[in-house]
Structure formats: structure tokens, C-alpha cells
Amino acid sequence: MNVQIGIDLMGGDHSPLVIWEVLIDVLNSTASNSHFSFTAFASHEVQEQILSSCTYKECPKIIASDSFVTMDDSPLSAIRKKSSSMALGLDYLKEDKIDAFISTGNTAALITLSRTKIPVFPTVRRPALLVRVPTMRGCAVILDVGANVSVNPEEMLGFARMGLAYRQCIGEKEHPTIGLLNIGSEERKGTEAHRQTFRILRETFQDSFLGNIESGDVFSGSVDIVVADGFTGNIFLKTAEGVFDFLRHILGDKLESDVKRQLDYTIYPGSMVCGLSKLVIKCHGKACGRSLFNGISGSIDLARARVCQRILSSLS
């Protein structure tokens, strides 16, 4: 399947040229083939700088923007920048000119702009950021990791349904199990919202719902899908990334290669904005080199798999 991937070169922690170089690396990769292409979005200045020095035989298309969304912009400020690189990229996605859109920029702005431009699944109340993390048994899917700070139990149920549909559509497990991220495994633990969510998940998914799960148990692989509100999920994810980086730093060459692979969360795509009718991927603002390479490559795979359409089909 031929796919067209859009990527915002602006707004991340690194220079747009760093992202461009990784994009070219993906094109040059022996693991890649000709069944995909890129459309990049950048400021006029960056466009001119890249095109004047691009030596790639078929330089990817670059769409020039009048502005870009910064990390300091509020969602409202981002909406007002109607010709930003992020807004143009999402417009292209909305108009089916591209099959997926990737950004390393402002998360809140990306979520807000995506929701204003891209239709949400009819059965979804709120989109969620979905990410895969390594476990002792492969990987787990966790959502939400930052799209929604405050949610109610019905919205958490929606996250569980989307996580289940995602796991099933990528074919990793026929009957995935679900856990609710909480401060303890007992049913009575957590806020009233967590206790209500526990009851709703148990009634809805029955034996597939294994109850509450503590942060440390996620990595055992005891559940396949971890449901969380965006505030808790984001803290969990950033703590996990920090611990993985810490272990690799202090142990260095003492780690066996297979252990390093198990600790390497960068092998997975960035966070998918799950619940949208089209594919939007948020890569870490600090992503560069291998982590961004894997994020882009993984996004290509998700676009080829038509993951959004398959999730919608599963939810219908």
C-alpha cells in the first residue's frame, strides 16, 4: 500500500534540520521501500535552507508555512495561527492529501488542533494519547498518557475500548486483558472516579478486566492494556522513560544486548492520538536519531495497516 506521510519539521526541541536528516535516513534505509513518501511542513526560511542544500535524488515535498507553533503557545494561541506548519499539516490530513501526520511539537496544541480539524469516531467522547511500552512479555498499551487531564468513568471506559480495538487490529493478541492504573490492586483503592471506573470496566469486560494495576506491575506484562487518566498516565510514562534512560546510563556496556532491547522504549512509534478518524502521531519533543527514526517508521507501518479505520470498525 502506498502511503503519504506528513511531518511537521517545526516546534520540537531540536532544529528542523535534525528532523529533516532523520527523514532522509528513513528514505535511505535498506529496510524501507518505495511504497511511501513524505510531505514536510516548515517555515519559508527552513524550506529555502533545505532546498538549497538537498542532495537527495527525489527531495521530499516541503510546504511552506507563515508561522509555527512553539512549545510556549497555549492551545488558543495555536488555533489562532491558522497558517502554522502544524495547522497546514492537519489540513492536508483532513483533505486526504496525506495518510498520517507526525509532530514533535506542543502536545496540547496538537491535541486541540487535531480535534478541531479531524472528526472523532462517533462512539468516542474524547480522544486519548496511546503509547506502547516494553514489558517482560512483550509490550503493553497504555492510554491516556496526556491528552486529557481530567476524565470521568464513562470516558475511561472509552479508553479501554479503544485500547482493546488497537491491540486486536494490530494482531498482537486475540483476547487482550485490561488493567486500571491505580495506587493499589484492591478494588477500594483510588478516588471515587477510579472506584466507579473499576466497577464499569468489570461489568463491561468481565474476565478480560483483571482489576487495578500498580505502576511497577505494568512492566511484568500482567495486562495488555493499561487504562489511565491523562494526568496519571503522563506521569507514569515520563517516569518510566527516565528510569529506562537512567539504567542504560549507569549500567552502560554491562547490559547485555537483549536486555538493552527490552529496555528500549524508542523502538515503538510515538503516541497515537487514538479516537480520531485519521492518523495523528505525537513523537517526543526531544526525539532525534534512532528514536525519531523508529517513530517515523512505526507511523508508516500504522498508516499501511489502516489502523484508524480498523479501530473504527472494531468500535462500531
Curated annotation (Swiss-Prot):
Cellular component terms (Gene Ontology): cytoplasm
Matches recorded under Pfam families: FA_synthesis
GO molecular function: phosphate:acyl-[acyl carrier protein] acyltransferase activity
Coiled-coil region list: none
Known EC number: 2.3.1.274
Pathway assignment: Lipid metabolism; phospholipid metabolism
Keyword hit for Metal-binding: no
Enzyme class, broadest EC rank: transferase
Predominant location category: cytoplasm
Classification via Gene3D superfamilies: Isopropylmalate Dehydrogenase (3.40.718.10)
Source superkingdom: Bacteria
Cited PANTHER family: FATTY ACID/PHOSPHOLIPID SYNTHESIS PROTEIN PLSX (PTHR30100), PHOSPHATE ACYLTRANSFERASE (PTHR30100:SF1)
Family that this chain belongs to: Belongs to the PlsX family.
Subunit structure: Homodimer. Probably interacts with PlsY.
Reported function: Catalyzes the reversible formation of acyl-phosphate (acyl-PO(4)) from acyl-[acyl-carrier-protein] (acyl-ACP). This enzyme utilizes acyl-ACP as fatty acyl donor, but not acyl-CoA.
Protein name: Phosphate acyltransferase
Gene giving rise to this polypeptide: plsX
